Structures are given as C-alpha cells and as structure tokens.
Curated annotation (Swiss-Prot):
Pathway: Protein modification; protein glycosylation. Encoded in RD10, a pathogenicity island with an atypical GC content that is associated with invasive pneumococcal disease. Pathogenicity islands account for greater than half the genomic diversity observed between isolates. The main function of this island seems to be correct synthesis and export of pneumococcal serine-rich repeat protein PsrP. CDD domains: Glyco_tranf_GTA_type, GT8_A4GalT_like. One of its GO terms (molecular function) is metal ion binding. It comes from Streptococcus pneumoniae serotype 4 (strain ATCC BAA-334 / TIGR4). Keywords: Glycosyltransferase, Manganese, Metal-binding, Nucleotide-binding, Transferase. This is Glycosyltransferase GlyA. Residues 1-301 are annotated as: GT2 domain. In the N-terminal section; belongs to the glycosyltransferase 2 family. In the central section; belongs to the glycosyltransferase 8 family.
Length: 696
C-alpha cells in the first residue's frame, strides 16, 4: 500500500454532540494511516468542543481549531488554510465514512493520475431509522471524465450520482486545486458553487460507483419553507455554472435546458408559497422570458445541411452525419429520400438533440425521379428538391460518400452575392475532358434564389429534356443550368481524393486533413480492397459511438492524434505485382502488432486477397495511376519489405532508399539493388527480430 502522500481530512463541527464520536471514530480507524485530521469547531454551544479535545488528545494526527461561529463554508475554509496534505477530503461531522474510504480513493487517484477521485454514498434517514442504498452490490464500475464531460453527469439521477458529484464530501482532491479557491460565505448550496470551479480546474476525474460515504439525513432537515433565498439557491449556482462554461467556450445546450427547468420549478414553488409579488419572483419571470426568446432565436439560426440518399446507403449517411456532429453544433439536417423508415428518423433525432441538432424527414416518391437515366443511382436527382423542403435562405448540400473534418462556420459565412450556388471546381473534368465545371457533391446553395426562381421545376424541365443525352446525370444538368453562374470554393471544401493530383492544393495551416474529404469513384473506403487515400478517416468516423461525438468539446479539426491516440501503427509496405510473397504469412502471424500494407497496381488474386483475414493486413488493390495513394503509402510506412517475387516497382524502392528508410529483403527476392538488408529464406526469424527491433 502506498503511504508516501499525506492526506488531509477536514471536519467542520457545529453542535453535533450526538453524532461526532461516530464521525471521528470512522476517520481515525481508516486503513490508510498517513492522514492529518483538521477539526474546526465553529463556535459550538453543546458538548462538541469537549469531544473534539478528547479525540485530539487520543490521536496525534488531529489538529483541533476553535473559532467563533461563522458557518459551514467559513469552517471548511479554516481547514483549507491549515492543511498540509498533498490531497484533501471533506467529511461533515454528522456523517461517517467506510473504513477503506481514504485508501480506496487514494489508490484510484494515483492509478488514473487524476485530479479528483469521486465515490458514491448511502443515506441514513434518522426520522425513519432506515438506510437507503443507491448502488447494488454487483454494479461497481470506474469511469474517467474530463473537465467538460463531468458537467454532463451533474444531472444524472440514477444511483444518486448527481448529488454525489456536486457535494463537497465523498471526494479526494489534489490539494493544489484549492490554492486560489475557497467556499463562498453566506450562500446556500455552497458545495455546488465550489465544485463546479474545481472541476473546471481539473484535467481528469475518476468516478467510482461504490458507496464509501454515509450521509445522515437528520430529523427536520427535509422540511423547507420556500423563500426568496431558496429560490436564489436553486437558480444562482446554475446561472454561475452556465457563465463559467460559456466563458470557457463549452457547449451549453444541456445546461440551458436544466436551467430552464430550474426556473420553472422556482416560479411554481414561489407562486405556491405566495411570493408572486416579490422582486425575486419578477426577476425570475424576466429571465424565463429572455431564455424562451433566446431559444426561439437559436432555433431559427440552425445551419441547414441537406443529404440525399436511399435506405441502402444508411451506413454512409450515418457516417457523414457523425463526422459533421463531431465538429459542429446547431445543425438542421434535411434528409431527402424515398424509403427511410420513420422510426429511423425518430431514433436519430433523439441522438441529435444532444448536439442541438435535428433531422427533418423529407420524403419524395420514387416515381418522381426513378424515370431519369443515371449511371450511378436515381437518388442523385433528389437534390433538385432542396428549395421545396429547406426553409433557410442558405443550405449546404453534401453527398453521402464524404466526411467533414472541421467546423463549417466559415463555409456557411461565405457571401454568395447573387450567385445561385457556390461549389468546388471539378479538376477531373478539366484534366480528362477539358471542361470547366463544378462538382455537384458539395453545393452551398442560395436557397432564397432557388425559391424565387422556382429552381426545382426548372431542374426537372431541363432533366426531362436532357437526362438521356448527358454523361454525368444530375451533375451535367446542374452545370448546364448554372453555367458561368457559380461561385468557386477552395478545393479544401470538396477534396475529391482522385483529383488532388490535378489541383494546386496544400493543406491549410492547422489542419491534418482536408475540410471535406469526398470519396468519389468506385473506390469507396467501405468496400473491401478499395484502395484510396484517407480510407482510415472514413472508418474513424464510422466507428465513433454517439457518446464519443461530444468529446470534441472545442470543435477542433480532426487530428491524427484523434485516430491514433497512443501512437501511429508501425507499418511495413510490400509493393508487388505478384501474389508470390516470400514468408508473408509467417511474418504477419509472428508480428501481430505491426501493420502490413500490401499494394499492387494490378488486381490482386483471390489468394492474396485472402490475407485480409489477418487484422494487421490491408490490401491496396489496383492502384495504377493513383499517385496520391503511392505517396501516402510511402509517407506512412516505416519499412519496405522487398520480399515479392516477379516484377519490381523500382520507383517505390528508390523513394525508400532516398528517404533513408529501411528496406529488408530475402536473397531470392532481391533483384534491384538499392542497399537492401538481405536475409536467406531460412533466416526469416532473423528478419522478424530485426523488425521487432526497428519497431521499438
């Protein structure tokens, strides 16, 4: 057991002669012995002082302090002013703690390198003589919070978690958190005022779902006469919380909803208690009116994003939505479709509420569009109906084979002037066909213009005439109608992965990835063996749980550290034109912590594709002419394994050699000399050991 750190236990005392012995007994018998007990007698008029002196003479670890009556907050502050421990905990003098209370919290705060360890509690109702246990014996768990997610749990009523989190007792704090903080004097609900400041100062909080603290409900303590003071006690701490969080730039949606409920409760109880004519009641009524007005204003200011798809694309739709919600708030999604179940829409709306967002069900009958010719899917024509459904003057249309990696406020702030839309140039159209057109996968739509000009009908009319005469379905139609009438956006806002080689594009400063990554072509990242750049980005968003989306509190752009929070995987590249790769299965099986990327400019055989049964193998299939994929493979691989038989891709070997990256080969596979480290085939174990050494 660790005993190096001294832990201070602060006990404020006032007229608790009937309870004090049990409290102090529970502290001096703690299994963790390196404690100091600061007992502050706040002017007691009963025998509490004598009991304190008796215990201080019995246990040298007790520091006994007497002061004139100044209240609970002042007594706790006196304890803080006189503590010498590295950690501090508070125990109210009418309560008691479990024998392993200090030891358990201390072990966890050290194990998790946290700033605060929080336990739960059970209650003893003195009037009833009954214990109330909020946690079942088999429901123990530990959960880590940061200084934002902890606030989301202050409203968690299950297992009385919210009370456990907001109370001063039941926690072990790093003492340094109180260097500039003290309890507010003269305020009801002082625990809440202090803890929300302490949580903001912390970086990590570990919560233990275990009852370690016994909270006594004394006779008469439940009776409350509703007064102006109690109205302020309920609302003011919440008001301060919102102010603190707003100043830190944290999301406020959930906190504002709770604040609104507290105002309603205070006003209802105030009216029932005859306080309707008081200044406090009128003040709270005004706050409620302003809050309702603000809510209506925020509702009208949601940013409109339009998606169009059929239900067979549900995974892709969800991935696109997740990527948007990870970096944005206050979004009104319009899903234009013909076959999404209403239940799916309802369930998704429950998810989106947490992001101050919603999804609008925009159903179009398939007969309206299925008659049109398209080489992709008739759903590409669904964007025609934007003006019929969207109420906002500006809307962002997004294809669902893309992800968003940053906040979109700057894009929405684009001045469209009198243009019907803004879009990114289709650099593939320029390179392959000599056409100066825009790509229709990302469109910032001047919806006020579209409504005024009845663009839905115009698009349908042009499509009726031309849909079977053009080669790119809706994109050709849109470019015909808006020729020379569109505002050009930066390639960053529609980074088509197969077009980067044609665009003069550099990542903007502060971004690890393009703002919007568009996986155009048949090489979709969700398809097996479909090689493309930024494949891991799509899978990152796809794999995010909804509870994880809210963790990007400051709405930062996607960073490589998000995808690889510990470290990027050590990767070996094999670039081959043959499925005969020497000792490949032995290497893959022996080195499960190393990633193997097998790339081929030709279509790989079934034999080689079978290697994807191993979780540390990725196949890059048929990547001829995909220069950016080659560059990504070279950049993200630490070792080149020249272990394939047959034709060599000499430029890849040269790139690794010029970069000074290791190249390992077998003697029977080395046919092009670039300074490889070669092994005999029967020395595969030596190659394995070499790779282990390099990977460290």
């Amino acid at each position: 057991m660790l005993v190096d750190d001294k832990i201070t236990v602060i006990v404020p005392v006032y007229n608790v002669e009937n309870y004090l012995r049990k409290c102090l007994d529970s502290i001096i018998t703690q299994t963790y012995k390196n404690i100091e007990i600061v007992v502050v007698n706040d002017g007691s008029t009963d025998a509490s002082g004598e009991i304190c002196k008796e215990f201080s003479e019995m246990d040298h670890r007790i520091l006994y302090i007497e002061q004139e009556n100044a209240g609970l907050s002042a007594a706790r502050n006196t304890g803080l002013n006189n503590m010498s421990g590295n950690y501090v905990t508070f125990v109210d003098s009418d309560d008691w703690i479990e024998q392993d209370y200090v030891e358990t919290l201390y072990k966890k705060i050290v194990e998790y390198q946290a700033d605060i360890a929080v336990g739960n509690y059970y209650s003893f109702n003195e009037s009833e003589g009954m214990f109330y246990f909020h946690i079942l014996g088999d429901s123990y768990y530990e959960k880590v919070y940061d200084n934002v997610s902890i606030f989301e749990n202050l409203y968690e009523t299950q297992e009385m978690k919210s009370f456990a989190l907001i109370s001063a007792w039941g926690k072990l704090y790093k003492a340094r958190l109180f260097e500039q903080l003290r309890f507010d004097i003269g305020k009801l609900g002082e625990d809440g005022y202090l803890n929300q400041k302490v949580y903001l100062l912390s970086e990590k909080v570990i919560y233990l779902n275990k009852s370690l603290y016994a909270y006594r409900i004394r006779k008469g303590s439940l009776s409350r006469v509703w007064t102006e003071k109690w109205m302020h006690a309920l609302v003011d701490a919440m008001s301060e919380r919102i102010t603190l969080l707003a100043n830190m730039g944290y999301p406020l949606e959930k906190h504002l909803a709770v604040y609104r409920q507290m105002l309603e409760v205070s006003l209802a109880n105030g009216q029932a208690s005859g306080l309707s004519d008081t200044a406090t009641y009128k003040e709270f009524e005004m706050k409620q009116r302003l809050l309702n007005q603000l809510s209506r204003q925020e509702e009208s200011e949601k940013k409109a994003i339009v998606l169009a798809a059929n239900y067979g694309y549900v995974d892709q739709v969800l991935t696109t939505i997740k990527s948007i919600c990870y970096h944005n708030r206050s979004i009104r999604f319009y899903l234009i479709h013909s076959d999404f179940p209403n239940e799916w829409i309802k369930q998704l709306n429950k998810r989106l509420e947490k992001f101050d967002s919603e999804i609008i069900n925009c159903r179009v009958t398939s007969e309206q569009i299925s008659c049109y010719k398209s080489d992709i899917s008739y759903t590409v024509f669904l964007r025609y109906f934007i003006a019929d459904f969207v109420q906002e003057d500006k809307a962002l249309y997004l294809d669902c084979d893309l992800v968003v990696t940053k906040n979109l406020d700057d894009l929405f702030a684009t001045d469209l002037q009198d243009y019907p839309l803004a879009a990114v140039r289709d650099f593939g159209g320029r390179a392959y066909f000599g056409q100066e057109i825009f790509n229709a996968g990302v469109l910032l739509v001047n919806n006020a213009f579209w409504k005024k000009e009845n663009m839905t009908q115009k698009l349908i009319d042009v499509t009726n005439e031309w849909h079977d005469k053009v080669d790119q379905a809706d994109q050709s139609i849109l470019n015909m109608l808006f020729e020379h009438k569109w505002l050009e956006l930066d390639f960053d806002y529609n980074h088509i992965v197969i077009h980067k080689q044609f665009a003069d594009y550099q990542l903007p400063e502060g971004q690890d990835y393009p703002a919007i990554i568009h996986y155009l072509s048949h090489r979709k990242p969700w398809k097996d063996l479909a090689a493309q750049t930024y494949r891991e980005v799509w899978w990152y968003y796809h794999g995010l749980e909804w509870t994880e989306l809210g963790q990007n509190h400051h709405l930062h752009p996607l960073q490589r550290s998000h995808i690889y929070p510990i470290k990027e995987p050590f990767t070996c590249l094999i670039y081959t034109a043959s499925d005969h790769i020497e000792q490949i299965e032995t290497l893959v099986q022996s080195l499960p912590d190393i990633q193997f990327k097998i790339a081929a400019r030709v279509i790989v055989s079934d034999r080689l594709a079978q290697m994807t049964i191993y979780p540390n193998v990725t196949i890059f299939n048929g990547i001829h002419y995909l220069v950016d994929v080659d560059n990504e493979l070279v950049e993200t691989s630490q070792v080149l394994l020249d272990i394939n038989h047959g034709e060599k891709t000499e430029e890849i070997l040269d790139q690794f050699a010029n970069l000074g990256k290791p190249i390992l080969s077998f003697e029977n596979t080395k046919t092009y000399e670039v300074g490889q480290e070669a092994y005999a085939v029967d020395q595969v174990q030596a190659m394995i050991e070499k790779l282990r050494e390099i990977s460290k």
